[in-house]
């Protein structure tokens, strides 16, 4: 009797395992294949300007951002400061996280898709994004982060029973300041941007992933939309780089001034006749 009960329990457990496994396999089949390593596709001739919002245009003013007059001035001041050795409006130069949308313009990406959450693994100072697809409502309060709070939904556009598109909305408040690119192309200082994205594979090339991303921000005169594309590495076992911004970063901000750190660990000016740091807390140093 005991043997029969054990056998029955084993058979039931096996049947449940097969059922769960089959259901899981069926669920996975509904989602697009985004496995592998993805990199931003850049227009030939612009490879040296990797980190920017619109990958088809030069960075800075060449992006054609619809900035308000106030934020055009912020951008111009940023570029002028950089010409004189400063960092301008670009906090990532001192290894602060870029946040949204810069974090979608950097290195290699990996997508981990489940039924309730999609993760975008980024690495470096931006780490990852978490996109909830479990049907949750927007929370009453959102803690400020660099990546923002993202809610998405899967869409079967052609009615074949498989998902084609992931629609995502990302809200703040964000941590800041943030910039689109290395010239300090700015987002508004209120850090209340909203981002709307549509991720989908190219219909003619499954190794190309589109991210149609729209920025709604008070520094803009209208929503700004670009098609960011990523190409999948055809190597089934790609190399994944380990990158930490602080390693080898020579920028050092003291007060509101940017200095360089030399290879032998000495402080260097970044522009002609730059004043040294305030040494008021070092009274033993001769003036």
Where are these regions (language model features)?
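Bacterial N-terminal signal peptides that target proteins for export
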Residues: 1-11
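Compositionally biased, intrinsically disordered low-complexity segments
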Residues: 6, 21-23
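Bacterial N-terminal signal peptides
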Residues: 9-19
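PEST-like low-complexity, intrinsically disordered acidic/proline/serine-rich tracts
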Residues: 23-287
């Amino acid at each position: 009797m005991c043997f029969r009960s054990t056998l029955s329990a084993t058979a039931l457990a096996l049947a449940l395992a097969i059922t769960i496994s089959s259901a899981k396999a069926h669920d996975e089949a509904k989602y697009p294949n985004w496995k592998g390593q993805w990199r931003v596709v850049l227009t030939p001739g612009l490879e040296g300007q990797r980190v920017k919002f619109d990958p088809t245009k030069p960075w800075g003013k060449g992006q054609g951002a619809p900035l308000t007059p106030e934020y055009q001035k912020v951008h111009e001041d940023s570029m002028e400061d950089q010409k004189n050795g400063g960092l301008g409006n670009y906090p990532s130069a001192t290894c602060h996280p870029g946040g949204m949308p810069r974090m979608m313009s950097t290195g290699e990406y990996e997508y981990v898709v489940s039924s309730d959450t999609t993760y975008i693994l980024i690495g470096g100072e931006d780490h990852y994004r978490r996109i909830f697809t479990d049907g949750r409502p927007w929370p009453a309060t959102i803690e400020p982060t660099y990546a923002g709070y993202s809610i998405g939904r899967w869409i079967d556009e052609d009615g074949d029973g498989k998902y084609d598109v992931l629609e995502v909305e990302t809200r703040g408040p964000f941590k800041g300041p943030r910039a689109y690119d290395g010239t300090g192309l700015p987002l508004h200082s209120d850090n209340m941007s909203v981002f709307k994205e549509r991720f989908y594979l190219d219909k003619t090339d499954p190794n190309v992933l589109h991210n149609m991303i729209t920025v709604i921000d008070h520094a803009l005169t209208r929503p700004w939309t670009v098609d960011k594309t990523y190409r999948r590495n055809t190597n089934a076992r790609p190399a994944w780089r380990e990158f930490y911004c602080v390693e080898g970063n020579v920028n050092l901000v003291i007060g509101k001034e940017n200095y360089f750190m030399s290879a032998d660990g000495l402080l260097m000016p970044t522009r002609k006749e730059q004043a040294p740091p305030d040494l008021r807390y070092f009274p033993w140093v001769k003036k």
